[in-house]
């Protein structure tokens, strides 16, 4: 053999690495490359090469930088994709941490690539959420009530140690005269540090209570005036958590089943907005205002010392764990994710309208239909979708699929006296309503299965809401690239 073999001959021509290479070449990586300008030095490896490596590793369910380094030595396809370059795990980890936000924002570009390939239809969009474990143990969390008890106990411990230290000082002064006493006893120092950590965590929860982000059980100065009784408890209201939407005008576009994007969809729900009865829809206190609005968090409000941004959430295994709430809006025609978000809110409902807005912003089109489960229902949200001529399929209550399928469809015209909830119940009993709602199960739930089980995203590697959010959006970007490859996407 006179010439060495070409690396591309090591893998078949229909292998996904060829598609990943082509897709990454079409992405705008200026947010990454600009980080090396203005005296930032040259990157040790081409950023395009590093992004290709991460895309293929995540597609194979490999996220550990050390396992990626091993793939670069042992996996033939990875060696071909990396042009036989072998960055070590330290380089891979630093690149991912440094450009994490930019990697997450590649998700929007994959949506545009799918749209360019004709794979974004927006005739029907299914929305759902899944809980992904945070990089923290639920045993690292402490409730506000336990914090108060522990702070009081440590206050007594510190007082006892101080009295003991003073007594020892006086005894040693009598025996030894002058001595150096600028260091704290070991037990006292540990108690002081622990108390300081707990009090900082209590302050975080108290600030969250004043903002209305956690359940409030007492408004101490105003309790008697409100007639709350001896306990000082007042009823808490369910807050929708809907951010007020700014009006944005999008580029007009045309697509199968979709319409040109008008002003951005939004609704500002009242504090007593109708809830959908979904899981985790606990109540929160209204934001405290005025000089008398001193609030205390509920004793069960949790703070995790490892990842304070994460929350205790119910999981699909009918258990509770330290998690984040990962949300996605998926095109029913192609299973392309058109909107993705991650938050530490337990309830799914507040994510519905922001996801529809994000899908419209990412594609320039409004979906014709939207389906979601009962956790997303509220009359305000349904009406907001209908005002923009989006046909919603969102049950007011959790559906038991066996009895629901056996129910006879309604006949005749709908009664005029039906409210929003009644009209939705009736619509979902029609043949058309059943068919459209069943699209949700075969659209978004398989996507979560592919990401969490086929590619192994059971837990985030990084801590903090911004880092976890970027990781989730990058996972969705990888999913879109793989979906385009399987559907044979071709760009003009």
Residue ranges and their predicted role:
Residues 1-5:
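Short, contiguous pre-domain boundary segments
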Residues 6, 14-16, 25-29, 46, ...:
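Poly-acidic low-complexity segments
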Residues 6-11, 434-435:
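Short, charged, low-complexity loops and linkers
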Residues 9, 58-61:
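Short, aromatic/basic-rich helix-turn unit that serves as a nucleic-acid recognition element
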Residues 11-55:
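Basic, short loop/linker segments at the boundary and entry of helix-turn-helix/winged-helix-like folds
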Residues 54, 61-74, 85-492:
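Anion-binding and metal-coordination hotspots
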Residues 78-83:
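Secretory-pathway/luminal and periplasmic proteins that interact with or process carbohydrate-rich
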